[in-house]
Structure formats: structure tokens, C-alpha cells
């Protein structure tokens, strides 16, 4: 219902295409097929499906989305595909050959392009992530592909490299604490900040919930709960929101978190003619 209502709102706003951004690669094949089909039936608009291959199963989700009627999908050249990148575009094209959705793309030409990027990638080998295989754990922690490698580097910089499983677990716990918010830049960074903060300070989800425990939350978390990045459809969990913002029942102006608002409405006007 959430996705269909969001699509209807976008359609009323005048969009020409609906883009489904599966940041973590957590949209499994059956869900991808049903979602794309429902969006097309509801709006009649073209649907573009984007995902990441952290799980190793994203190509199946892309093919299912195509089966559901997707008009555009994202893939990566063979040499740059897989893991936290997009699924293999060459494999997707090959899988569709001979069927109703045959792309007509010349795979020999694609391979020539891929060979170029294979050479270019070698130049950046010293900066490659140490991730060597996909992980189904992404279905649990829901960490966006664009954040996964960066957060591992942050963990290493903080001396938490050997505690990465704890960081991933904390990420999942923070997501639940925050009310299962949409995790994409910049909100995903806030979830990551809090996960690192919890592991570095040996805090559990119960510790964060405990009203008697004083916690100096990271500034990015305070900013999120102030609504500076927007508000989720159902708001933030009230008890945690009051704790993060330091709401005090003894002071009427601080007794409750702020009501939802559009952050841009509070910005000073800008004269674009200047």
C-alpha cells in the first residue's frame, strides 16, 4: 500500500516515470515481479528497476522485474559488476535472448567495452574493497550497496574491523530502533553512524531504549530526529524521539518532538536571478 500510494502521489505531481531504487539489493525476485506489475497497473507509467548485487541474487530480481513489466533496469558491465555494484548486464542480456524481451544488444560489442573497463579497474586495484563474495546477510541488515564498503572502511579506521559482524548486527538494530526508515543517502549514513557509535561504546538496543541511561547521541542522529532530513510516513518512534531530542515534560516547549514539516520550507528564499 505504501509504494502504491507513493506512486499515486508522484503521478499527481506529474512524473513521467516511476523509479524503484532497491538500495540494499533486498528486493527478492517474487517481490520485484509483484511490485513492478502493481505499479504499472496502478499508474500506467513506465517503471525503472534499480538494485545492487550484495546478496549475489540480484540478477534473478532484475529478470523477475522484467517479467513483471519493467521498462528499464540497471546493470553493470561484466568487469564492474557483482557484489555491491549492479548485477552483470551481459548475463541479463544473454538470459533475455530469444524471448519476448530480447534486448537486441550485441554481446560481442558489450564484451569489448567490458575489456576496456577490466583494464581500467586494474589501475585502482590498491583501493579495492576486501569483499570477495556476496552475502545473504544483506537481507537482515539492509545496508545499501553504496554504503557497505564505506562503512567497513569507517569501522577499520575506528579499530572495529574485527568487530564487523557486530557492526552489521547493530545496523539492523538501529534500523528497527528508528522505525525501519528508508535507508538511502543521507539517512543511511545516520543509521551507520549510530551503529558504529553503539559498537564503539558497547551499547545494546536495550541500552539505547532505557530512559534512565544518558546517551550523547551523534549529531547526525539528532539532526535526523529533528526532521532536518524529512519525516518517515509514520513518524519516528515517540519514546526514542523524545530521548534523542532531550524532550523534558517540565518544559512545555520541549515536551514533544517537532511536528512533521518540509525542511525546505524553513530555508530563506533564494533569488535565482542573481
Where are these regions (language model features)?
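Active-site beta-loop-alpha junctions enriched in small/polar residues
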Residues: 1, 21-25, 50-56, 78-80, ...
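Alpha/beta enzyme core
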Residues: 1-47, 63-70
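Glycine-rich phosphate-binding active-site loops on the catalytic face of alpha/beta enzymes
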Residues: 22, 68-85
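Active-site/ligand-binding-proximal alpha/beta "capping" segment
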Residues: 29-43, 114, 118-150
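Thiamine diphosphate
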Residues: 53-65, 75-77, 90
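C-terminal helical cap(s) of enzyme catalytic domains, especially alpha/beta-barrels
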Residues: 81-104
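Phosphate/diphosphate-binding loops
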Residues: 102-117
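Terminal or standalone catalytic/regulatory effector modules within metabolic enzymes
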Residues: 132-136, 142, 146-274
Amino acid at each position: 500500500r505504501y509504494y502504491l500510494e507513493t506512486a499515486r502521489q508522484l503521478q499527481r505531481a506529474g512524473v513521467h516515470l516511476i523509479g524503484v531504487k532497491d538500495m540494499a539489493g533486498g528486493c527478492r525476485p517474487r517481490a520485484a515481479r509483484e511490485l513492478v506489475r502493481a505499479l504499472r497497473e496502478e499508474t500506467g507509467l513506465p517503471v525503472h528497476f534499480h538494485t545492487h548485487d550484495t546478496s549475489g541474487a540480484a540478477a534473478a530480481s532484475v529478470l523477475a522485474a522484467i517479467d513483471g513489466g519493467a521498462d528499464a533496469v540497471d546493470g553493470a558491465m561484466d568487469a564492474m559488476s557483482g557484489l555491491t555494484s549492479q548485477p552483470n548486464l551481459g548475463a541479463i542480456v544473454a538470459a533475455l535472448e530469444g524471448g519476448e524481451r530480447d534486448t537486441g544488444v550485441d554481446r560481442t560489442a558489450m564484451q569489448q567495452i567490458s575489456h576496456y573497463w577490466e583494464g581500467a579497474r586494474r589501475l585502482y586495484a590498491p583501493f579495492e574493497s576486501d569483499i570477495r563474495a556476496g552475502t545473504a546477510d544483506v537481507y537482515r541488515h539492509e545496508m545499501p550497496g553504496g554504503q557497505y564498503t564505506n562503512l567497513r572502511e569507517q569501522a577499520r579506521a575506528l579499530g572495529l574491523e574485527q568487530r564487523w559482524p557486530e557492526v552489521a548486527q547493530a545496523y539492523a538494530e538501529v534500523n528497527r530502533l528508528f522505525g525501519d526508515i528508508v535507508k538511502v543517502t543521507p539517512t543511511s549514513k545516520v543509521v551507520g553512524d549510530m551503529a558504529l557509535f553503539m559498537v564503539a561504546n558497547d551499547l545494546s538496543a536495550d541500552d539505547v531504549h532505557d530512559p534512565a541511561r544518558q546517551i550523547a547521541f551523534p549529531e547526525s542522529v539528532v539532526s535526523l530526529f529533528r526532521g532536518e532530513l524529512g519525516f518517515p510516513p509514520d513518524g519516528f518512534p515517540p519514546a526514542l524521539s523524545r530521548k534523542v531530542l532531550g524532550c523534558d515534560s517540565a518544559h512545555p516547549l520541549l515536551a514533544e518532538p517537532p511536528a512533521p514539516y518540509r525542511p525546505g520550507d524553513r530555508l530563506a528564499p533564494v533569488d535565482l536571478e542573481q
